[in-house]
């Protein structure tokens, strides 16, 4: 009788442990093909202190959480960049959905902001932050924004 009860207990424990293994779950992971995007600059213009950029968001535009427009002044001082030097962004403008200057319509993104000295040349790039923190930011190439023409 005791052997029979031990056999039932062992069987129940084995079934319990086996049943737990069936429900093993993994943490969800981002599907790179569905959740990744790239940014491509289509057009940019400067007017005085302001810059307007039009970009294409290629891929999962719905995952674009925010953008950083990273920039540096071009000049001869030690805290300034130069054409041909490695790009070291010294300042950045953060824009998010709902902010003035951030307009996302489908896969078209328009950014507007006014922080520039109209007489200085700048180098800049745009970094798009993905809503899924496991995926890296998407960045454009580095571009030059010439000083505004005299008015």
Stretches with model-predicted labels:
Residues 60, 74-76, 129-133, 145:
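Short coil/turn motifs at secondary-structure junctions
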């Amino acid at each position: 009788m005791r052997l029979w009860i031990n056999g039932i207990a062992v069987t129940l424990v084995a079934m319990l442990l086996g049943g737990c293994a069936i429900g093993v779950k993994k943490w969800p992971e981002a599907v790179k093909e569905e959740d990744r995007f790239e940014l491509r600059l289509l057009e940019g213009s400067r007017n005085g202190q302001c810059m307007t950029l039009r970009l294409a968001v290629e891929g999962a535009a719905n995952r674009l959480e925010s953008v950083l427009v990273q920039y540096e002044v071009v000049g001869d001082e030690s805290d300034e960049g130069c054409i041909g030097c490695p790009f070291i962004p010294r300042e950045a403008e953060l824009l998010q959905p709902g902010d003035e200057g951030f307009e996302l319509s489908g896969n078209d993104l328009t950014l507007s902001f006014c922080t520039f000295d109209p007489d200085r040349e700048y180098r800049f790039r745009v970094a798009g932050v993905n809503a899924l923190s496991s995926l890296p930011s998407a960045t454009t190439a580095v571009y030059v924004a010439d000083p505004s023409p005299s008015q």
